[in-house]
């Protein structure tokens, strides 16, 4: 494992280990690296990770740190020696291009970018963003778009509740609490923390360079319902993981893509 030594990396490491303890109790952790945020150079960590034969390497690195790690480790054969899982990597695909190793399992902290479910709304969003910025949208633009759509819904509901007059902050908050709305990444539900925390479906996939399109595509996309990957109401995430995902509702209707996402 290699995760950054601050809250995000530490929490990601903990959640991964708790999940593995339930899903694959026979698996044993080996090398565990926690470089500082923004380290940039990972030669020592890569040597440590490759010093032992392991089936899987997990990482929650992101942004420039993730790009640097991939560019430094791929030439040394790390991605061929072990299955690498990058939980938040979709945003580096456009920049890395064919330098992104094939067969890497990646996530996007949601069903974003190449893993977004097909819908007229997503098609409109994808085309509009791509035309404006000359690159397709990844997780951050998707999150901003769905947040603005949620805000639009709350404002409209609050205005109606306040008879067309400018609503107070309290009325705005009440309008958003417990609501649901469509987004390019699928349905967003304010389902946890008394209707004040959103959940949504998520997905993972495997990278594959497409020479004809000159871009990284995703194969074997696996989809998971929001209620399958989030704890039930009033249960802390860590307690839920320790319980073996008690109360998880995993509907097979979420489906798996048999072909690369286009």
What residue spans do the PLM features occupy?
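Short, well-structured alpha-helical segments that form the helix of a local strand-helix-strand
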Residues: 165-185
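Sec-exported extracytoplasmic/periplasmic mature domains
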Residues: 17-25, 50-54, 71-78, 130-134, ...
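Extracellular/periplasmic periplasmic-binding protein-like sensory domains
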Residues: 72-146, 156-163, 217-253
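Extracellular/periplasmic Venus flytrap/periplasmic-binding protein
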Residues: 1-75, 115-120, 124
């Amino acid at each position: 494992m290699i995760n950054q030594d601050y809250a995000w990396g530490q929490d990601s490491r903990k959640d991964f280990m708790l999940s593995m303890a339930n899903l694959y109790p026979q698996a044993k952790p080996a090398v565990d690296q926690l470089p500082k945020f923004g380290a940039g150079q990972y030669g020592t960590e890569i040597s440590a990770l490759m010093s032992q034969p392991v089936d899987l390497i997990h990482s929650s690195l992101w942004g420039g740190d993730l790009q640097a790690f991939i560019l430094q480790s791929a030439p040394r054969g790390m991605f061929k020696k072990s299955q690498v899982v990058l939980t938040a990597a979709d945003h580096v695909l456009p920049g890395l291009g064919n330098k992104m190793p094939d067969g890497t399992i990646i996530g996007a902290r949601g069903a974003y970018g190449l893993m977004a479910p097909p819908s007229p709304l997503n098609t409109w969003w994808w085309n509009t963003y791509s035309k404006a910025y000359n690159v397709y949208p990844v997780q951050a633009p998707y999150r901003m778009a769905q947040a603005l759509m949620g805000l639009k819904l709350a404002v409209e509901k609050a205005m109606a509740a306040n008879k067309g007059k400018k609503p107070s902050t309290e009325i705005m908050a009440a309008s958003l609490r417990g609501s649901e709305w469509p987004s390019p990444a699928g349905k967003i539900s304010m389902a946890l923390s008394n209707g004040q925390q959103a959940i949504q479906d998520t997905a993972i996939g495997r990278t594959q360079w497409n020479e004809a399109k000159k871009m990284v595509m995703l194969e074997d996309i696996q989809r998971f319902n929001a209620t399958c990957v989030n704890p039930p109401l009033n249960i802390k995430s860590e307690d839920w993981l320790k319980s073996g995902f008690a109360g998880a509702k995993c509907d097979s209707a979420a489906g798996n893509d048999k072909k690369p996402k286009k």
